[in-house]
Amino acid sequence: MILLAVLFLCFISSYSASVKGHTTGLSLNNDRLYKLKYSTEVFLDRGKGNLQDSVGYQISSNVDVVLLWRSPDGDDDQLIQITIKDVKVENVNQQRGEKSIFKGKKPPQIIRKENLEALQRPVLLHLIHGKVKEFYSYQNEPPAIQNLKRGLASLFQMQLSSGTTNEVDISGDCKVTYQAHQDKVTKIKALDSCTIERSGFTTRNQVLGVTSKATSVTTYKIEDSFVVAVLAEEIHALRLNFLQTIAGKIVSKQKLELKTTEAGPRLKSGKQVAAIIKAVDSKYTAIPIVGQVFQSECKGCSSLSQHWQSVRKHLQPDNLSKTEAVRSFLTFIQHLRTAKKEEILQILKAENKDILPQLVDAVTSAQTPDSLDAILDFLDFKSDSNIILQERFLYACGFASHPDEELLRALISKFKGSFGSNDIRESVMIIIGALVRKLCQNEGCKLKAVVDAKKLILGGLERAEKKEDTMMYLLALKNARLPEGIPLLLKYAEAAEGPISHLAVTTLQRYDAPFITDEVKKTMNRIYHQTRKVHEKTVRTTAAAVILNNNPSYMEVKNILLSIGELPKEMNKYMLSIVQDILRFEMPASKMVRRVLKEMVAHNYDRFSKSGSSSAYTGYIERGPHSASTYSLDILYSGSGILRRSNLNIFQYVGKTPLHAIQVVIEAQGLEALIAATPDEGEENLDSYAGLSPLLFDVQLRPVTFFNGYSDLMSKMLSASSDPISVVKGLILLIDHSQELQLQSGLKANMEVQGGLAIDISGSMEFSLWYRESKTRVKNRVTVVITGDITVDSSFVKAGLEISAETEAGLEFISTVQFSQYPFLVCLQMDRDGIPYRQFETKYERLSTGRGYVSRKRKEILVAGSEFPLHQENSEMCKVVFAPEPESSSSGWF
């Protein structure tokens, strides 16, 4: 009995050791042939999960797996052979019927004979402890075909115990988590952790950016240390943040099922795996199991010059308001990204002056080394003969979706050279600031070019001797928003003269809340309350805005409220409107304002009944569950009724994240002499000036001057028409996302989203002494096209989903002031044109031989035009300003 017990324990001990030896990964039995059924399928849709509404394809086959060699030093060192046989390609959507692109075609016709032969050649997999040590295949096989074999081979890499580790497979070097439970193992691959060389870029701005999500789960059913069934599912979903109808999803599945086992070839003996492989076939070579990049053959693709000729007519100046112009702009950018410098230069040099600005927009927006070299060779900054082209180039740089260090380095080099136009020199510095901001947002603050640009901006601001240079560096800092620049801004805000002081405060206004420290707020309070010196109204009101928009304290709010009633007349009304707007629109400061208003000393009739024409109002353009867009308009007048500043802002929100889409600020000063009026306190010695400062998609652009100085004003009044001055005009690449994906199945996927717009912002200021009336106009006209393109490619069959949306919108702001009486009459109008919105969806499946299936859908709606509401006082005033002419009661001569 004791002897039996000892023998039993020895048996258990040896059995346990054997199991332990096999728990690290799959283990094949000697001299057995495993016959399996394998399929990989992929389908694309807009995220609705309806298979009948999707496009895609399925590749299926039989698979033979045998163990060729096992190391005599350990069971977990194995060499296995995997052979794909009996390949089929068919629709994933079985309801396609007669429309199936595979109908009547055999695998050699679909895949091509040479590709099919390569696909069915065996591969060898060297596994140690369940992990891939080497992957062996034949050289010179098409990468796309090798990737399909890699996708199958990667399924055999797994471990039988729970835990988290890193594995290298077709997806790259990835973090994976195993969950083992009895005869089932689940492998979760963190796709965002995978290290693999793939091209791609994205727009870092959260509002204009794309949200993508990827998951990969593989479930193994294990029996006798080998797979009975494997099911892998990989999902990639994408959506545009502010327009969620631009969305798509790729679902890729792999299924592997054991059908039977039968007698197989005997194990090969030997200690070195290299000798075994050579004995099997000396042509085998070790290649990476990580998926390799391949380019599909492009049949009938046009050259750059051919494509340019096909889209050129749509980019003529008269056609820029049409959506076809923006679509042509986007497609041309895609062609430019694969073009060489010489090809691009050839087109630039051959074009006429009318179409060159649009061509410069496109070449700059391509953002490739070749396109940058071409445009820099083409433009001559030492000449003043092509200023429009230089400015269009610089604006396109400022709006760049994914700028690199080389672009910034090029602009720094240009700035240190000579210029034919001082306006262009200013624009270069302003755009340098914008690029610094974008590169820092992309974790590039320590790049040498960024460090050099910071020194250039801050050093230039500190040493500037001319007013124009100070303004230029302040505008650059307004774009860059460098924390280290705040002490300089505080110095200029408090001590400098009016325009510089105002620009310094508006620059501080652009900083995020964490940078508006107690020290900053103390300075803003001193400016607003004029404790050290007298400041212009524009400076004081902007300082108040900085305080109120950045977590104001109880005493800060109370002191601002108590000041109302002690300010100049129009400033009283303006500050009162600001407070009322905060309360009505429930801005962050509204809770603190309500707390303070519980005190009677702050909340009384005298304070809240101040008259005047200045105003502030915020409202919604559109409001949805995920996003919203708002407009705000505040206008400050001088005591004599002349416009001092109008500020129009449009913000786009995704959740609580804002994008400052548009800001148009019109400023005027020193015009009181025209109507023999008395200037306000602190503004007695201001030169006559009017200008417009634009900000577009978070990028401050160079301000435009209407007139500067009394003589310039008089000449403009006597000679100028009411034609508006163009402030910003051009084509902008606003959204730019490109992602190349290596699917676990071996297929290649691409997800791209592009958004472009044609924009035209113009402004005018009309002044009539005869009618004692002034008019200010700001016109915004935009045409927007957004395209999403998702494809899955095997090199012999391709499925794709294209979604696009387009719209045209116009917004006009008119301020009319009649100062023939006092109080003067003011009417503000904000009108929006009717907005057509169109959405298109195209789904397709296409063989490399040309046969295809296409499905198209279209949706169109019209949003009626409207006049945006402003405060009630404005509505009443407009009725007086535009009162109908009284009808004559007499029909005779007298």
From Swiss-Prot:
Broad class of the protein's primary localization: endoplasmic reticulum
One CC-aspect GO term: endoplasmic reticulum
Reaction(s) catalysed by this chain's protein: a 1,2-diacyl-sn-glycero-3-phosphocholine(in) = a 1,2-diacyl-sn-glycero-3-phosphocholine(out); a 1,2-diacyl-sn-glycero-3-phosphoethanolamine(in) = a 1,2-diacyl-sn-glycero-3-phosphoethanolamine(out); a cholesterol ester(in) = a cholesterol ester(out); a triacyl-sn-glycerol(in) = a triacyl-sn-glycerol(out)
All residue ranges annotated as the Vitellogenin domain in the record: 28-662
Cleaved signal peptide residues: 1-18
Covalent S-S links between cysteines: C174-C194
Taxonomy, superkingdom: Eukaryota
A Pfam short name: Vitellogenin_N
Cellular location(s): Endoplasmic reticulum; Golgi apparatus
Keywords: Disulfide bond, Endoplasmic reticulum, Golgi apparatus, Lipid transport, Lipid-binding, Signal, Transport
InterPro entries assigned: Lipid_transp_b-sht_shell (IPR015819), Lipovitellin_superhlx_dom (IPR011030), MTP_lip-bd (IPR045811), MTTP (IPR039988), Vitellinogen_b-sht_N (IPR015816), Vitellogenin_N (IPR001747)
PROSITE patterns: VITELLOGENIN (PS51211)
Function: Catalyzes the transport of triglyceride, cholesteryl ester, and phospholipid between phospholipid surfaces. Required for the assembly and secretion of plasma lipoproteins that contain apolipoprotein B. May be involved in regulating cholesteryl ester biosynthesis in cells that produce lipoproteins.
Assembly and interaction partners: Heterodimer; heterodimerizes with the protein disulfide isomerase (P4HB/PDI). Interacts with APOB. Interacts with PRAP1.
Protein name in the entry: Microsomal triglyceride transfer protein large subunit
Organism this protein belongs to: Sus scrofa (Pig)
Lineage of producing organism: Eukaryota, Metazoa, Chordata, Craniata, Vertebrata
